[in-house]
């Protein structure tokens, strides 16, 4: 072909920072001398191995950044003179660049030729690129490779081979003996090649990530070429370890600016959460246990409390002082309250208002213990229940030392009277148990003589027992501290499913045996049918008639 190559540029041994360039010249049929200048303006730096499995095409990363090769054509007797005449856009021909992959370091051939050593590195993607005529960054032709990938990790380099298809006969090579005739279809002629710098192909685990698109890639994409542009940084931490020096990323400053630019406060999460309900909590006030000792948690229900009413001398009741009988208010009918066993009974908080009942001396015998029955007169036939309202009870502060007579049971206070005027004593809170109805049949009238009238100051309300049971004599006795009612009888055994028992279907006759060898049950006298000598029938008026059967015809 009569091509001449400049040795200083064609060997490609340049500094890594400088782009590799290659220059080659040839003489056409018409005698023109053309100079081809091929230069890699954007070198590949890294790539991620995509493997060779069935899913290798689904998650494939291209070589980053995409290689870009520049081609310029000059015409002149020498290369220095030819640079003054650039004919890249005027030259009528088609060019394409074909990329191949090779190892950066030539592997020595070993004694054992393994298949992996003989297999060349596999390049996937689009290895062919046509020339694009662009104005920027220079008036030249550019070859772009935005879709090149490598299947195996290692250190490689790319080799770009330039092919030309001439359109005019004057621009073709001089005649050769073995050249095809002019009437043959067009062909591509190899012009030159150029190699890129070495780049590293990482595995999927060690791949540091794709970098931001270079200014050259953006410039080429702005002119209509199909190049992937990444405006965000996709760098991965090195070796999976943190670095206190702030160099976790290769471009830490760009990553920091990007993070600040894209950080947007989430206003949806700034809504105030609904406050937690404290209906059953003791954290209502900082001093809830001191200011409200009678407060009980809402999760446990306690039975109504009983109060011993002791009216004062200036009370509104008109019957005070008119009777010598004393009376204890009858207890209300029992009510069942469900309370979990894990809830302890409410503690009793002693206050200074109950001190007179606990420390004043008394000249009378102490009240009966909880297991003793409450004595009342025999002639009391009607009983009323003192209304209980724990919310309106008030502890009596001033206790009078005078003695008062209590009205008979028939003149007890009606439930409609107000309760805030009756002094009462806050009873002890007891664990909830189901109490049976109180039954009081008879009591000795002599018990009234043994217990004279006791003033409110000398009288202490006896604690109520936890559970009661009725004795044989009709009196009310205590069954113990935590005794419960007798358990209900066990339910009758249920037959599994809805099937009938065996005895309901078959006879349970001990004399019944298994019949074998054609044996049958012997007929009894009762089982034999009576002779058909007579028959009965009922007439229309309801009478029964008997008639002798005529069996003589047989």
Curated annotation (Swiss-Prot):
It comes from the Eukaryota. One of its GO terms (biological process) is sporulation resulting in formation of a cellular spore. Residues 363-372, 485-494 have a biased composition (Pro residues). Residues 455-487 are annotated as: PEST. Disruption phenotype: Results in increased conidiation associated with stunted aerial hyphae. Residues 166-190, 232-430, 465-528 are annotated as: Disordered. Keywords: Cytoplasm, Nucleus, Sporulation, Transcription, Transcription regulation. Residues 31-230 form the Velvet domain. It is found in: Nucleus; Cytoplasm. Residues 166-175, 500-528 have a biased composition (Basic and acidic residues). A motif (Nuclear localization signal) lies at residues 45-50. The C-terminal PEST domain is a region rich in proline, glutamic acid, serine and threonine residues that is required for the light-dependent regulation of development and secondary metabolism. Component of the heterotrimeric velvet complex composed of lae-1, ve-1 and vel-2; Ve-1 acting as a bridging protein between lae-1 and vel-2. Component of the velvet transcription factor complex that controls sexual/asexual developmental ratio in response to light, promoting sexual development in the darkness while stimulating asexual sporulation under illumination. The velvet complex hat acts as a global regulator for secondary metabolite gene expression. This is Developmental and secondary metabolism regulator ve-1. It comes from Neurospora crassa (strain ATCC 24698 / 74-OR23-1A / CBS 708.71 / DSM 1257 / FGSC 987).
